[in-house]
């Protein structure tokens, strides 16, 4: 007999060789039905793995985040199974889990399009209903290579060749086998709520020199209700797509001459200025001085900073007069150069610098997505140089600033996470231990709850991430606060301590809205283009019922502009109903409609974008009304 301890502290006896499914059945049939895996002494295992010794056990169900990930990974295998049934000559490659779903890359011998997805999905449902048990075997690499080579799965052979371990796992369901670390669901009947969503192209291993594969995306959920809710959200997201709204509102455009870099139009620049001016005022409030540094620097600077060895593939390089240069992918190394121009005492610290710095990153063309994923963007970077003793207080201030900013922009629901050391990093473990603990202490001191993200920190330090939830429930990773002991040392930043000795300052990197391009894209989708008054590119449209009111329209328009209102004058010889509809589609918050009565009484009639009639008032009263709303960020 063995003893199994449960999360509530209780201990029960079981026969040696029992598995997690058996344990779940002994508690309740419904629990067994929902169980897909288990943590056995903190190791995630398949639900049918035998337990042969005393242990701590935590069952994982489809309702747990880990369970949902297993469900989605297993659904990717089901997709590959269905594709092999329908198109036997197809070679399968990889099928990972992504946000809200999964994808699988295939090398098809025949042409496949979006129209084929319903057929593949139907086959997936047929296979799932067979309730085929899912099992695995551990085999030597050589045996696995022979197994997949015999099936003509050359991509799998290449993957196995690249694995350092001497043994690998092969999972099997019915007549389909796939290479995988697992764990997976106990049987295919668990997969009930899934849908294939789209098809795209993807290069093998992300390298454009390799074959273009067909990537099929899907989503999978614990229940059909969850799936339906997600699909409804996707439908709503389609309506809010910032690329479509940006075209309607004449904000920006993209073209192939400059892939991944936006061309901003007048209306878009108006929004940009509001965001930038707001952040500039916020930085002033929190004691940041503003700097501006070069976009291009000698490649030796990037070698010193560590970017050349860790980030070179994402950097744009150029050559001039036999010197190698790089266009900056990040602002921090050039900011350190400003700090280094003066001798600093510990009494000078903290020194807070802010920069709206343009950066360029060589993102793969397939990953570009409107304003949300670009190759050139402006970052609202801040860099704070301080002593180790000042770190926690500075982080607390930055967290407060972030919370304040997000609420003013209308994001009231957000989560805080700490991204911990990645595998590819600079600096020793002792420094990383100290850095990670400092961020935890700062959040604890501010009573901020947070989630830990192992392996997701920057190569030079851990970071706090702010994830904002938008109006339709999507989560957006936005601001970051990063702790860095390494870069100031590598770039020669120092200060004189109270003993007259040179010390290296701690460097805090922070971005609150992050990429201004991406943040504006988020705002457009969050508000479905109906931006709050203070952000709207055009706040008021002024129009007359007939051309007889043109002079009065001009007079009202001029008064609004003098009061700092972003107004648009519409004197076109069109029917008033047409003008109202057009400016409503353009999401103008307020429409001023002027007729003979308004002209004679020197008043205005106001209509909200929603269609609500606000009645009549003087221009001065309307300006005061607008100003109050703008100041309140409503």
From Swiss-Prot:
**Catalytic activity line of the entry:** tRNA(Thr) + L-threonine + ATP = L-threonyl-tRNA(Thr) + AMP + diphosphate + H(+)
Extract the GO molecular function terms from the UniProt entry: ATP binding; metal ion binding; threonine-tRNA ligase activity; tRNA binding
Provide the top EC class: ligase
- List all disulphide bridges recorded for this chain: none
Q: Which Pfam families match?
A: HGTP_anticodon, TGS, tRNA-synt_2b, tRNA_SAD
Q: What is its EC number?
A: 6.1.1.3
Q: What is this protein called?
A: Threonine--tRNA ligase
What taxonomic ancestry is recorded?
Bacteria, Pseudomonadati, Pseudomonadota, Gammaproteobacteria, Thiotrichales
